[in-house]
């Protein structure tokens, strides 16, 4: 099996080795990933396989509101870790790399939730990726509509 490595971004992705997952809105987010990492608005990782840069992903902390349950002490807010996106270059998609990255992010989130008050790992899935996330153990959940990501399905694990 090839070596998978996630490394925190230390600079913008060079224009000489661009990454495109084939979805313009996600490709645009990759362009801002390093800036968001510097400003502590998220943590972007470059994804390497056998030393080659083949993708990028981002996680961040979010605060969600769960008004449906009544077991909260004072309010209905809780912290969650969000996978903002996973982008694998379209030239290497279909080889299981995204599945390995997702498994790694799930494992890392489970470890963090043991030392930090993180309740869920959440994401907004594109319609054509919902089954992929279901297969990884995610479920859908009700969430207030987020107009920034209107064509997505909220999911959590």
Label the model's feature ranges:
Residues 1-95, 100-122, 126, 130-157:
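Non-catalytic substrate-recognition and accessory regions of acyl/acetyltransferase enzymes
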């Amino acid at each position: 099996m090839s070596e998978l490595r996630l490394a925190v971004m230390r600079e913008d992705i060079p224009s000489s080795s661009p990454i495109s997952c084939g979805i313009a809105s996600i490709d645009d987010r990759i362009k801002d990933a390093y800036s968001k990492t510097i400003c502590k608005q998220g943590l972007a990782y470059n994804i390497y396989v056998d030393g080659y840069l083949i993708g990028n992903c981002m996680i961040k902390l979010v605060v969600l509101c769960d008004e449906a349950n009544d077991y909260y002490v004072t309010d209905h807010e809780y912290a969650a870790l969000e996978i903002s996106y996973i982008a694998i270059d379209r030239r290497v998609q279909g080889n299981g790399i995204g599945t390995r990255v997702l498994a790694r992010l799930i494992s890392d989130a489970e470890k963090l939730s043991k030392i930090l008050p993180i309740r869920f790992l959440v994401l907004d899935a594109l319609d054509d990726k919902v089954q992929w996330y279901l297969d990884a153990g995610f479920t859908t959940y009700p969430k207030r509509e987020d107009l920034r990501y209107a064509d997505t399905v909220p999911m959590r694990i």
